[in-house]
UniProtKB/Swiss-Prot annotation:
Record's subunit section: Homodimer. Probably interacts with PlsY.
Source lineage: Bacteria, Pseudomonadati, Thermodesulfobacteriota, Desulfuromonadia, Geobacterales
Catalytic activity: a fatty acyl-[ACP] + phosphate = an acyl phosphate + holo-[ACP]
Organism: Trichlorobacter lovleyi (strain ATCC BAA-1151 / DSM 17278 / SZ)
Pathway assignment: Lipid metabolism; phospholipid metabolism
GO biological process: one example: fatty acid biosynthetic process
Alphabetized UniProt keyword annotations: Cytoplasm, Lipid biosynthesis, Lipid metabolism, Phospholipid biosynthesis, Phospholipid metabolism, Transferase
Pfam families: FA_synthesis
GO cellular component annotations of the record: cytoplasm
Record-annotated membrane-spanning stretches: none
Protein name in the entry: Phosphate acyltransferase
Functional description taken from the UniProt entry: Catalyzes the reversible formation of acyl-phosphate (acyl-PO(4)) from acyl-[acyl-carrier-protein] (acyl-ACP). This enzyme utilizes acyl-ACP as fatty acyl donor, but not acyl-CoA.
Length: 345
């Protein structure tokens, strides 16, 4: 199953995308379609001696820029690399699409081309965070800044299914991000969502606070995209600042430098644990297919890992299982509508 890579997205495209794709093909044996300017992509491939790898090129004559309007770009730039990557998924030529380009356009392209899973109102962008207990999935981290309670409940359903079947967590616990653990805490949105989640068959643990994310108190944390994006950017900034401060302290003291020599292995393992490149990208969950959104400044390692995670996601059966779990909890979502359970599709 091939993975389509938007090779023209990102701050350093197409060099980084091609380097990451070549690494993924070499290391994991994943067949890849590079989508973008054919001449430029062939030139980049020549730099990596990739003639023996299962990498093909699908020409795209347009590129969606970082400052383009997401919806307009997807509709007007029909031959853009990000849209064509999702078209390849729709046509069955690829199992997943990966892009480090305009995240809004990537989300819009996924929704416009692949559509949403039946019953899902809003797809969500999910991000894996390292924790003291392993890893925690947080969603939404930027796709939907204004949400209703039904959206957050659907995020919880999607998060539990993804954590179980794509991340391999047997019975993931779900927490709703709030400003306290008591049911009386939160705002109108979280209190309404909390009440609905308690009626579902999900493994719901109640409210969690920001500090619980890195403790690993639960394996899935649900929030709206505004809060989630703040959490994500704060975490990235904190990790970067911590590393810089630590390096400054070590380099400013001779004894600290000597101690570092003995602890170098531990520092390298820690750096690997908190390095976003190890997690590749953030899956767009809730569309009828697989899309992976990468940081615009991703390096080749991040692209390589995003391709691997996208391929694993595509083979996990998550999309079908989300529809089934949604049907199972439809009564809690819409208790007074009298509507029948939507068909699993």
């Amino acid at each position: 199953m091939r993975v389509a890579v938007d090779a023209m997205g990102g701050d350093n495209a197409p060099a980084i995308e091609v380097e990451g794709a070549v690494a993924a093909s070499r290391q994991y044996g994943i067949p890849i379609i590079l989508v973008g300017d054919e001449d430029r992509l062939r030139q980049e491939l020549d730099h990596h001696a990739a003639s023996g790898l299962d990498i093909t090129i699908h020409h795209a004559s347009e590129v969606v820029g970082m400052h383009d309007s997401a919806s307009d770009a997807v509709r007007k730039k029909r031959n853009s690399s990000v849209r064509l990557a999702f078209e390849l998924v729709k046509d069955g030529q690829a199992c997943a699409a990966v892009s480090a380009g305009n995240s809004g356009a990537t989300m819009a392209a996924g929704m416009f081309v692949l559509k949403r899973i039946s019953g899902i109102e809003r797809p969500a962008i999910a991000q894996v965070f390292p924790t003291l207990e392993g890893k925690t999935l947080v969603l939404d981290v930027g796709g939907n800044v204004d949400c209703k309670a039904s959206h957050l409940v659907q995020f919880a359903i999607m998060g539990q299914v993804y954590a179980k079947h794509a991340l391999g967590i047997p019975n993931p616990r779900i927490g709703l991000l709030s400003n306290g653990e008591e049911d009386s805490k939160g705002n109108e949105l979280t209190r309404e969502t909390n009440a609905i989640l308690r009626q579902t068959s999900l493994n719901y643990a109640g409210y969690v606070e920001g500090r619980d994310i890195f403790k690993g108190t639960v394996e899935v944390v649900v929030c709206d995209g505004f809060v989630g994006n703040v959490v994500l950017k704060l975490s990235e900034g904190l990790a970067e600042a911590t590393g810089t401060m630590l390096k400054r302290e070590i380099m400013g003291d001779m004894i600290a430098k000597m101690g570092y020599l003995f602890m170098r292995g531990a520092f390298k393992r820690f750096k690997k644990t908190v390095d976003y490149a190890e997690y590749g990208g953030a899956p767009l969950i809730g569309i009828n297919g697989v899309g992976m959104i990468c940081h615009g400044g991703s390096n080749a390692k991040a692209i390589k890992n995003a391709i691997r995670f996208a391929h694993d996601y595509a083979t996990s059966g998550v999309t079908q299982r989300i529809a089934e779990k949604l049907s199972e909890n439809y009564g809690a979502l819409f208790p007074r509508t009298g509507q029948s359970v939507p068909p699993v599709s």
